Amino acid sequence: MNVTSTWIKNPLAILADNSENGVVIQGNKIIELVGKGKKPKSTYEKVYDASDSVVLPGLINAHHHFYQTLTRAFPGALNKELFPWLKSLYKVWAHIKPEMHSVATELALSELLLSGCTTASDHHYLFPRQLHDAIDIQVSVVQKLGMRATLTRGSMSLGERDGGLPPQSVVQDDEEILIESERLINNYHQPDEGSMVQIALAPCSPFSVTTELMKSTAKLANKFNVRLHTHLAETMDEENFCLQKYGLRTVDYLDSVGWLSDKTWLAHGIHFNEQEIKKLGSAGVGICHCPSSNMMLASGICHNLELEEHGCIIGLGVDGSASNDGSNMINEVRQAMYLQRLKYGASKVTHNRALEWATSGSAKLLGRDDIGEIVIGKQADLALFKLNDMRFSGSHDPLAALLLCGAQKADRVMVAGQWLVIDSQIVGLDEGELIYRHSAAAKELSKLSQNY
């Protein structure tokens, strides 16, 4: 079978070295970088003129909760910090039906894709009885859209009755969680280069799972060589919970259950002291910075630069769309740059550094060395942005303008060599119909929660 080659020609700007005149794509891979004033050495059948486009590696979202798109700007959860925010929404989320979860996943992924995101990791930890096959549903939606995903089998096993935060209606027992985790790995995890679906294991947080489950999950992940993920040190409430229940701060607790390794990435990671930062860095633990969520819930600011300095990888995530309340990845890069500048100053947090967190940084968090960069041999995942909106008029540095002028939508997005977005529209998707179905599901969920 002949594989078509395409020259993405003469980009306005590109986040790659020695590629001023573009890149050549063959099948699902990048096969050549075309330097300034040069033409491809490789043969090519198609040419795409990118002279009005900024070309980025596909953005990678390393932490999300797709189902939360159903409870954006939810009245009972407004103007609250993490623990009261969660308690107000657990009782709503407990009523999510399979069809609601499916449309929430489709909308979250579509919103991400339109913002230039080509790979997304979802942390789904909510399994009320009617939603036992939540990850299977997500796999189907991911395959339908053609994006890449790391779907994490989350869990909650420590309910209010046993001193945890979530209500009993959304917790499972440890054995059920471990059996399901192994089933999902066996059924869906693709460890090979270029894979479209991977599975990771992700107990929700120290305040919602048992110590035994944390230990058993680490052993299971090691057995199947999959990655580990959880929320950690998002708020001081969490630190206080761990001190009161376990007599340990969060990092020491994580160490005690066998989680400090380079196969672990953590969401948020805000409230670490200097010794803990060094300990995490020595172990190679990754941190997913979620700036919009951290600002919305007033959680704090992640110590990105100290963490990087001591060996941690930093990536980016939009977090749940009820604590953001969006799923826009290019906007999240802008938020990260601005929030980190407040902490470290403008010169230390450049637009290039923020973009690297959202591309190569997030790829490393997910354990992927085949995506996240425009490099020969890596997957052809690209996001192209045009600077023809009013917001960009008068801008001079195209890469900087993406963030400083507030890009919102990609013009084209390629995943594995296939255009999934053309002219800021997802190929084959009726956006209006999706919004209608999603809005109806959100309204139904709200009504269900009010009846209990």
Q: Which sequence ranges carry the predicted segments?
A:
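N-terminal metal-binding scaffold of metallo-dependent hydrolase/deaminase domains
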Residues: 1-41, 53-55
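Metal-coordinating catalytic core of metallo-dependent amide/deamination hydrolases
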Residues: 130-269
